[in-house]
A protein has these predicted regions:
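Polybasic, low-complexity intrinsically disordered segments
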Residues: 2-5, 10-54
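Patatin-like phospholipase
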Residues: 52, 56-104, 112-354
Length: 354
């Protein structure tokens, strides 16, 4: 049942909402002090889900500056997006409106949050939300719902009065074009979802879930009879510049989740992987092909930079992995990303002409 913390005689950040499982026996003042300190964790308060705001009280950030002729391209990377979500928050704070956004995997979540003009959801999705006990764990993986429980993370929490309510009305009102990429398990081919595919919020969220479905860690997602996994297995290895190119763009602001000198290594035991994926052989081949595709895309980005056709944000460091669940580390990654965004802002302005 929902309990408004502001009804209690304990000072906490506002607005804030706590959900307790029915029958939970907790010392409520101690709980509120823990919330105030920011140390509510899965282990300390397992039945708790923090909802940092009510959607009805949230106002979308205005877009005041149009970016002409440049597409925004958002790489995936799971929880590494804690670092790069700061880039989106910074752009929203500046009111920058790109005409086109392409996102894959975690980048698809950033795409939706950016178009809905929601900096708070952008930040929380890859930081504090990881403390939610229903986010996923070994138990949910063994139960067949995935190490990250995709249905809960992407579809359930976006609903009103849930952990991360999504402003679908603002999203629909936007004129920005976008593409979200996923990979078909049948042939390993790339599928691009656009605004025309998303008549309802669940249409959007299930496609973000499909784009973010890590093979082996999350079960495939079926949409209209077609089964999908992570879009990072597609043609460019997870950097969806091809989505923007399909819509005619030749100038890009690319946000990567790996440092500039990163090179993706080949799969060590391809035959073992083929055996593990014997029921979906195209997925195995896409995983095996991904390092070469990814490295080729990074080389293409370097060429585009040299030609003045791309600005690429590379993290100076990457302190978290794609499966990180420690909120303190995720917050630190976000802070590092924001510090880098602030430092690079003058270069952004020069490239974008704003």
């Amino acid at each position: 049942f929902p309990l408004r913390v502001d009804d209690l005689d304990v000072p906490v950040p506002q607005p804030f909402q706590v959900f307790l499982d029915e029958g939970t026996d907790l010392n409520l003042p101690d709980l509120c002090r823990a919330v105030t300190r920011g140390d509510v964790t899965r282990s300390s308060h397992a039945p708790i889900i923090a909802c940092p705001r009510q959607l009805t009280t949230w106002q979308a950030r205005p877009m005041t500056t149009s970016i002409d002729g440049t597409a925004l391209v958002l790489e995936g990377g799971g929880m590494r997006a804690a670092y790069t979500s700061a880039v989106i928050v910074k752009m929203l704070g500046l009111g920058w409106k790109f005409p086109h956004v392409s996102g894959i995997s975690a980048g698809s979540s950033l795409t939706a949050n950016y178009i809905s003009r929601d900096p708070e959801r952008t930040r929380l999705s890859f930081t504090d939300f990881a403390a939610d006990p229903r986010f996923g764990n070994l138990g949910t993986w063994l139960a067949g719902r995935g190490y990250f429980d995709g249905e809960y993370i992407y579809q359930r929490t976006a609903e009103p009065h849930q952990a991360l309510p999504f402003d679908f009305l603002t999203f629909c009102a936007s004129s920005q074009a976008f593409r979200i990429g996923a990979t078909r398990t049948s042939d390993g081919g790339q599928e691009w979802f656009t605004r025309e595919d998303m008549k309802t919020m669940d249409d959007l969220m299930v496609r973000i879930r499909a784009s973010s479905t890590m093979p082996g860690f999350m079960p495939p997602v079926t949409i209209e009879g077609v089964e999908y996994v992570d879009g990072a297995l597609g043609d460019t290895g997870g950097i969806p510049i091809d989505g923007a190119q399909l819509d005619g763009y030749d100038r890009f602001f690319v946000v990567c989740t790996r440092p500039r000198d990163y090179i993706k290594n080949e799969v060590k035991r391809p035959q073992t992987l083929r055996r593990l994926c014997r029921h979906r052989p195209a997925v195995a081949e896409a995983i095996i092909a991904r390092p070469a595709r990814y490295n080729a895309t990074r080389e293409m980005l370097r060429d585009l930079e040299s030609d003045g056709k791309a600005y690429v944000f590379y993290p100076r460091v990457m302190p978290v992995t794609n499966k990180e669940r420690n909120v303190t580390k995720l917050r630190q990654a976000y802070a590092l990303g924001m510090a880098q965004a602030n430092a690079e802002l003058p270069q952004w302005r020069v490239f974008l002409g704003v």
